[in-house]
Amino acid sequence: MNAIITRTYIILIPVLSILLSGCTEEKSIKAAVVSARKEASKIGVEIMKKGGSAFDAMIATDLALTVCYPNAGNISGGGFLVYRTADGKTGSLDYREKAPIAASRDMYLDKNGNILPDKSTLGGLAIGVPGTVAGLEAIHKKFGTLPWKDLVQPAINLALNGYVVTEKQELSFAEKKQDFIKINGENTFYAQNFRANDTVKNLALANTLKLIAKHGKAGFYEGAIANDLVERVQETGGIITHQDLLSYEPVWRDPINFQYKDLNIYSMAPPSSGGICLGQIMKMIEPFNVGDYKHNSMEAIQIIVEAERRSYADRSLYLGDPDFVKIPQNELLQEKYLSDHMKSFTFERASKSTDILPGTISWEESEETTHYSIIDPMGNAIAVTTTLNGSYGSKVFVEKGGYFLNNEMDDFSSKPGFPNMFGLIGGKANAISPQKRMLSAMTPTIIEKNNKLYMIVGTPGGSTIITSVLQTILNVYEYDMDIQTAVAAPRFHHQWLPDIITFEPNKFKRNLFDSLQKKGYDIKEEYNRIIGRVDAIKVSDKGIISTGADPRGDDEASLLY
């Protein structure tokens, strides 16, 4: 077994360094990385200290998360990048996973048309064709300044020298241990009893990264890594072949662009639903001046929830992979269409999701995702959200390679009208088809104000990604919160179906729930999972950089002065 564990019990006294958690605001800050792990954030900043750009730092940060954040960091999943260069040019990269060539619409249904339990979430059949390494190489070819091998080496070093398990990770490993054993056997790498403060060295992953450092994309999609991946997928019931790996290509796309008051917002286009849904919700609430109501007041919550309800209804019908289905993108963001959508809203009574159908248009995702935000000294900004979908993906572990494989196939509509693991309803537009990209809720977002960079924001959280990003933006813009306060503020969520407002536990007052219930809203609070873990960067009109790292996770910011 390629594992080395050391266990220490040392209390460390924090010292002042460039690695800081939470909100920092200093005129001297030149660059920042905010991610799910301090090791990854620090590696990203170290790359920029050596003269690398935000794009170089992105590659190094991403690969570091593969090592120290194995529940979502990955070389075997996919993601989305939204960027803004220092001269104001914007764009995005789609390196979302794809369905295998052998995939079929009804592959998760039995002979009676019923969904087969766990087939799209656990084991080899749940695995989509990975896009991460191809995406990273595409970014490097277009924007990279430092040599590729220099960007991979820090992750290799981290795998060899080890990362320290946090208390939250200890709980995560323990929670999934039986799934790891069920799929991979008792001797699988992450079935060991890793505990907080252990140092975990993943030698197999270090060797995998060495091949990627030497051969780039070809090192993953061809040769020994590809052979081990295909073998592991197929022996656990999957259908990915070498042809699937060789045919994978990422796609450069135009981001969704919309205005909210004096903000100019760029977010991810389909196959992510994030940009369109975020745009719809913000345009629907704009006429109500939500900032006139107290933060998280009943009225503010009503406005936001009713807009969310209507947008998620549209999501279920219209959104999918634009390479396979025609998406009425412009119509979905038209002000008249959105205004008509909200006409049935009243403060007096909750709308019912059963009465809210997707709007009529004439026209021919896991909570264990991870997000990071980066700004470099030149002013380049990137927002990246990447995922294995569920926590540790399919739970299939490639022992020879040291990494988990995704369960991204669950983000398709296995059966139109039925929910996925996050409770999201999908329609025919998101039905399974060979080499199709599955719909996502990932919402990496970059915002301008007065033609200047204003905010970089995103989060994991499955179906709650869109609403968590939304509330963070509103907290800063409408309620004048600093970025750390905005990131940490209590959140709530509605997604059309199920017709429930989900509140972060123990953060809202009982009398608020009573008032909402009297108006016909169903409330859920007890035993809910955390709603998002936002990582964000804000730039003031004077150019002062501040960071927000979500305290709900182990997230930290690393800064370059």
Region locations from a protein language model:
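M16/insulysin-pitrilysin zinc metalloprotease superfamily fold
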Residues: 181, 275-291, 447-455, 461-487
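Bacterial N-terminal signal peptides that target proteins for export
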Residues: 1-11
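Internal maturation/activation junctions in enzymes
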Residues: 287-387, 397-401, 416-417, 425, ...
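C-terminal motif of bacterial Sec signal peptides marking the signal peptidase cleavage site
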Residues: 20-22
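Extended C-terminal subregions enriched in glycine
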Residues: 436, 478-529
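Noncatalytic scaffold domains of N-terminal-nucleophile
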Residues: 25-42, 46, 54-216, 220-222, ...
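Active-site rim segments in enzyme catalytic domains, especially the processed small/beta chain
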Residues: 67-92, 239-241, 381-449, 479, ...
